[in-house]
Regions:
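Intrinsically disordered, low-complexity Ser/Thr/Pro/Gly-rich regulatory segments
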Residues: 1-71, 76-196
Length: 196
């Protein structure tokens, strides 16, 4: 019988191993390049698991009324809809082509989590429809207590489900399931947290 949990953990371990390789070479002097490398690692991992007609880029999305998102680390789009601009992996995509967006962080702390969720929510509003809108952080720092963080709960409520997936390090995953049918103003989020 297949062991899907072990399979997913092996992918997680691969990402962890790859993320440290460049840091071990460059040391602490070039964290910006280290962050870009981590985006590349995640892009390649995603591309290896997506169908051939689904592409990955970085750049901007044009929404209704020619509104433009802030810069997006990873844009997942279909090649069946023409892009507005492309140079290498840099794209400007119409909202109709976009299937998902991901903000990539080396490390999230309670201090920058709210800003990151707000940034991703704003980009989701410009896209104007439900898409995969995720935040992927290789690590998360002190102050983020997943199950009891009032700050996290408050920020997620304000995002109104626009951010629907958050990965914090190798051990924590948060998913938005929609709205509570008995309380339409209440978002339903759940966490999978394997941290001991």
């Amino acid at each position: 019988m297949p062991d899907y949990v072990a399979y997913r953990k092996s992918i997680s371990n691969e990402l962890i191993d790859l993320k440290d390789r460049v840091r071990n070479f460059i040391g602490r002097g070039h964290w910006g390049e280290d962050g870009r490398y981590k985006e590349i690692i995640l892009k390649e991992c995603l591309q290896n698991h997506l169908p051939a007609n689904i592409k990955i880029g970085t750049g901007f999305i044009m929404g209704e009324g020619n509104r433009i998102t802030k810069q997006i680390d990873i844009i997942i789009y279909t090649d069946s809809c023409p892009l507005l601009f492309q140079k290498g992996e840099f794209i400007i995509a119409p909202k109709e082509a976009v299937l998902g967006i991901i903000e990539v962080k080396t490390k999230l702390t309670i201090n920058n989590l709210e800003e990151t969720i707000a940034h991703s929510s704003e980009n989701g509003q410009i896209v104007g429809r439900t898409i995969f809108n995720g935040i992927f952080s290789y690590e998360y720092g002190m102050g983020i207590h997943i199950e009891r963080s009032e700050v996290l709960k408050s920020v997620l409520r304000r995002s109104s489900g626009l951010v629907n997936y958050i990965c914090l390090g190798p051990d924590c995953f948060i998913k938005h399931w929609g709205y509570d049918t008995d309380h339409p103003n209440r978002n339903q989020y759940s966490t999978i947290n394997e941290q001991i």
